[in-house]
Amino acid sequence: MTSKLKIDFVSDISCPWCAIGLSALEQALDKLQGEVAAELQFQPFELNPQMPPGGQDIGEHLTQKYGSTPAQQAQIRQTIAQRGADVGFAFNPNGRGRIYNTFDAHRLLHWAALEDAGKQHALKKALLVACHREGQDMASHEVLVRAAQA
């Protein structure tokens, strides 16, 4: 008998650990296929709701928010890249240059959920790739439209 499970995944597109967490969750659910039928719904969480238009240099942002040094940031990027590789999510090897406001991306994800949970899941994955692999501006409506069309 298959058990039904509803999962609310609360995350921000700009968070690399959220990309890793989603990939790890997908792997775990794949292993439970036939035993667990999971309904995955994405809930918004803005890490940086006050992020200005045009975003901010990622190194500057991490130093201001967490007090980290460039050396610490390089180490954590390496850790993130390795953990991502472990769960099948490839990050841009050069990291990201900027961090952007994700409010409109969350609005788009909400709309996608109203259409279909599968569409929301596909959009979430496309947005994570656009942000973490391609370094796209997550506040750009053009970027969001391309992700929605993918």
Where are these regions (language model features)?
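Short active-site neighborhood of thiol/selenol oxidoreductases, capturing the structured segment around
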Residues: S3-P16, G21-L25, L40-Q43
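Structural alpha/beta surface segment adjacent to cysteine/selenocysteine redox centers
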Residues: L22-C131
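Residue-level preference for well-ordered alpha-helical positions
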Residues: T63, A148-Q149
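Acyltransferase
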Residues: L128-A139, A148
